[in-house]
Amino acid sequence: MSKRTFQPNNRRRAKKHGFRLRMRTRAGRAILAARRGKGRTELSA
């Protein structure tokens, strides 16, 4: 039997998909801008 692939971890989640990571790159800021434009209540993990 293989194990489940999703092993939740808040720290890993924030490091990979967090707000500060998004702000670091131009592409990341574009993602945030798109999500703001769409009206998302949550912008990032």
UniProtKB/Swiss-Prot annotation:
PANTHER family: LARGE RIBOSOMAL SUBUNIT PROTEIN BL34M, MITOCHONDRIAL RIBOSOMAL PROTEIN 34 FAMILY MEMBER
Gene Ontology biological process: translation
Pfam families associated with the record: Ribosomal_L34
PROSITE patterns registered for this protein in UniProt: RIBOSOMAL_L34
Gene3D superfamilies: 1.10.287.3980
Name of this protein: Large ribosomal subunit protein bL34
Gene Ontology terms: cellular component: ribonucleoprotein complex; ribosome
Superkingdom of origin organism: Bacteria
Parts forming coiled coils: none
InterPro entries: Ribosomal_bL34, Ribosomal_bL34_CS
HAMAP family in UniProt: Ribosomal_bL34
GO MF annotations, alphabetized: structural constituent of ribosome
NCBIfam families for the chain: rpmH_bact
Family: Belongs to the bacterial ribosomal protein bL34 family.
Keywords: Ribonucleoprotein, Ribosomal protein
